UniProtKB/Swiss-Prot annotation:
Catalyzes the condensation reaction of fatty acid synthesis by the addition to an acyl acceptor of two carbons from malonyl-ACP. Catalyzes the first condensation reaction which initiates fatty acid synthesis and may therefore play a role in governing the total rate of fatty acid production. Possesses both acetoacetyl-ACP synthase and acetyl transacylase activities. Its substrate specificity determines the biosynthesis of branched-chain and/or straight-chain of fatty acids. CDD domains: KAS_III. The gene is fabH. Its main location: cytoplasm. Keywords: Acyltransferase, Cytoplasm, Fatty acid biosynthesis, Fatty acid metabolism, Lipid biosynthesis, Lipid metabolism, Multifunctional enzyme, Transferase. This is Beta-ketoacyl-[acyl-carrier-protein] synthase III. It comes from Jannaschia sp. (strain CCS1).
Length: 326
């Protein structure tokens, strides 16, 4: 017998403010349209955090929903991992703020920063903690307020991103170790820092002393995304001992519909096996995968025993995949 990290609870939170593409059409000097945005990204609307609403507050709300779904109390959690690139403060971590917000009195907490690949990296960390016996239950959260780092004069980026949070609870359970058993079957992580200029924020504590805004070379990111996401997903499946034909759902990072459809096509799967939420959420960076998972579970598409592939790529570049049996 071995220990598997099994999903036992999930939840998400989206800010109240819904921003349709029409709001960007009305912005002076931006020169964009609903048709232009939909054609290039598939995005119809996104959610923006209210003034004063923080990443940690959204993370706490999503976490409470995941705890309710799992019928657990905060003190049942051994560790909290938050994937985010938009923390409330330089320090302490958002994860410790979540601990405080939930009223947790024990365990440990830390943040992971891999931008849009953050949730995949956080899942891999949580899995390692569980299978090594260092934690039994881990609360894994992706939460972002990307609306705070947008360049509102750049139509190629500001229309793409949204805010939100998603939370998943993993629990260690005995397993025979077969691909048919529930839990995380494999993880596959990569990064290449030589591509920093393709996607970054031009501010920081030790450099400019400012928050900065997001900068992206979209065409180059697209090219790397299709190649790297397909390869990491293939590797993840091979590590798990399963094939593309075994996959019930792909739950990708919701970057834009072109990257999602291009990757899945190269992967050899139809779009009806993909959980797509980008039209409603935009790109919520590290929050996008748990948001999509939560929607898929909530509407009944994702069922116990289903085989899921999650994959993501973000600034760094950093990318990876996780294969799990729900």
């Amino acid at each position: 017998m071995i220990i598997r990290a099994v999903p036992v609870g999930i939840g998400h939170y989206l800010p109240e403010r819904v921003v349709p593409n029409a709001e960007f059409e009305a912005m002076e000097g931006l020169e964009t349209s609903d048709e232009w945005i939909r054609a290039r990204s598939g995005i119809e609307r996104r959610h923006f955090a209210a003034e004063g609403e923080t990443t940690s507050q959204m993370a706490v709300t999503a976490a409470r929903k995941a705890l309710d779904h799992a019928a657990l109390n905060p003190d049942d959690i051994d560790a909290v991992i938050v994937a985010t690139s938009t923390p409330d403060l330089t320090f302490p971590s958002v994860a410790t703020m979540v601990q405080a917000g939930l009223g947790m009195t024990g365990g440990f907490a830390f943040d992971v920063q891999a931008v849009c690949a953050g949730f995949v990296y956080a899942l891999a960390n949580a899995n390692a903690l569980i299978v090594s016996g260092q934690a039994n239950r881990v609360l894994v959260i992706g939460a972002e307020t990307f609306s705070r780092i947008m360049d509102w004069t750049d139509r190629t980026t500001c229309v793409l991103f949204g805010d939100g949070a998603g939370a998943l609870i993993l629990e260690g359970r005995d397993s025979a170790g077969t691909p048919q058993d529930r839990g995380i079957l494999s993880t596959d992580l990569h990064s290449d820092g030589t591509h920093r200029e393709l996607l970054y924020v031009d501010g920081g504590v030790s450099s400019t002393g400012t928050t900065g805004v997001l900068k992206m070379q979209g065409k180059e990111v697209f090219r790397h995304a299709i190649e790297k996401l397909t390869k990491t997903a293939d590797t993840g499946l091979a590590k798990a001992g399963v094939t593309v034909g075994d996959v019930d759902w792909v739950v990708p990072h919701q970057a834009n519909i072109r990257i999602i459809s291009g990757t899945v096509k190269k992967f050899g799967l139809p779009m009806d096996k993909v959980i797509v939420t980008v039209q409603d959420h935009g790109n919520t960076s590290a929050a996008s995968i748990p948001l999509a998972m939560s929607v898929g579970v909530g509407d009944g598409r994702i069922q116990p025993g289903h085989l899921l592939v999650t994959e993501a790529i973000g600034g760094g570049l950093a990318w990876g995949a996780v294969v799990m049996r729900w």
